[in-house]
């Protein structure tokens, strides 16, 4: 059967949506199982519309790929998400999609100072492990999905001098959140640099709830934040951080407790978060607040064009 990979335009998004919701891919693409989650991901400020592809076999949609292009220190990195439905696997579809992504990314490597190409998948997935190895990727990181059993949440103990407000949509709140995020995550693995406009896009997405974003201020400066997200039944502590000058005072724990309580009050089932498996301080905090590792996400990397 002829295998064709072509760009995924707006007219192809229904096919991508249907593929992502195939039972063989639903677990890997949980966010895409709801309309709000699908729309938000396709409108992500770091997912260019020209970095999406659809593969067909004999005219039938068989798989897809899309690539996030994330700005970071000194350049950017690409994270390619790929899916091939079960009945079309072991037919070269994944390899063809990766080749299309790599060719497009290689063409813009110098323009965007692209440093690396990444793949990821939930464990266990022996097929993905083998695919990554065959295509020259090396395993570089594990990220963990940690879940917390429903139950009593400790009351946030806000440090002295800290005032917490939910997001009010003002330019001041937007700028404070964006600045605090960049300062909090600048030293993290795969830090994604965010502009004010990037953050504005996030606050306009379907999942965003102003009352689900807490901003912690010391005097007039935003020094911490916790943003929650809902896609269907689960609830995620999607983004939590403190600026370097506000660490070690209990602010992170207080924000985490606020986020968990907000999600439980919103009837989220389960409550979860994602964490870098090598972020020991965050892991200690999350475990001490009742979170346990539920799933492991494998990350692989290679140079663009290899």
Feature map (PLM): residue ranges:
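Acyl-donor-binding surface of acyltransferase catalytic domains
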Residues: 60, 71-73, 86-162, 298-302
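A short, internal acetyl-CoA/4′-phosphopantetheine-binding micro-motif in the GNAT/acyltransferase core
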Residues: 54, 68-70, 79-91, 240-247, ...
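Conserved acetyl-CoA-binding loop-helix of GNAT-fold acetyltransferases
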Residues: 90-106, 242, 248-265, 284-288
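Conserved hydrophobic beta-strand within the GNAT/NAT acetyltransferase core sheet
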Residues: 80-82, 117-121, 237, 271-275
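A conserved beta-strand-loop-helix scaffold within acyl/acetyltransferase catalytic domains
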Residues: 29-46, 65-73, 190-235, 240-241
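Short amphipathic alpha-helix that is part of the acyltransferase structural core
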Residues: 1-40, 157-192
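A structural microfeature
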Residues: 63, 141-142, 224, 295
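Short glycine/proline-centered loop/turn elements that form peptide/ligand docking sites
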Residues: 256, 279-282, 299-304
């Amino acid at each position: 059967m002829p295998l064709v990979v072509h760009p995924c335009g707006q007219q192809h998004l229904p096919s991508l949506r249907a593929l992502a919701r195939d039972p063989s891919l639903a677990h890997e693409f949980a966010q895409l199982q709801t309309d709000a989650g699908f729309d938000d991901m396709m409108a992500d400020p770091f997912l260019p519309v020209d970095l999406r592809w659809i593969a067909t076999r004999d005219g039938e949609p068989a798989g897809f790929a899309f690539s996030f292009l994330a700005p970071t220190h000194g350049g950017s990195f690409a994270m390619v998400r790929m899916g091939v439905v079960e009945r079309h696997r072991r037919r070269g579809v994944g390899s063809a999609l990766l080749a299309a992504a790599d060719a497009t990314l290689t063409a813009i490597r110098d323009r965007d100072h692209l440093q690396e190409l990444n793949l990821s998948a939930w464990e266990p997935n022996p097929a993905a492990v083998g695919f990554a190895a065959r295509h020259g990727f090396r395993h570089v990181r594990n990220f963990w999905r940690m879940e917390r059993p429903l139950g009593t949440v400790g009351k946030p103990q806000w440090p002295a001098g800290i005032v917490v407000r939910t997001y009010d949509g003002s330019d001041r709140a937007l700028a404070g959140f964006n600045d605090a995020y960049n300062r909090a995550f600048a030293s993290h693995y795969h830090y994604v640099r965010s502009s004010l406009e990037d953050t504005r896009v996030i606050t306009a997405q379907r999942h965003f709830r102003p009352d689900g974003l807490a901003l912690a201020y010391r005097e007039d400066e935003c020094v911490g934040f916790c943003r929650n997200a809902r896609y269907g039944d689960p609830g995620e502590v999607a983004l939590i951080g403190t600026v370097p000058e506000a660490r070690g005072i209990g602010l992170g724990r207080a924000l985490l407790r606020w986020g968990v309580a907000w999600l439980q009050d919103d009837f989220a089932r389960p409550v979860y978060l994602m964490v870098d498996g090598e972020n020991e301080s965050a892991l200690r905090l999350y475990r001490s607040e009742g979170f346990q590792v539920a799933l492991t996400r494998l990350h692989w990397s290679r140079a663009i064009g290899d």
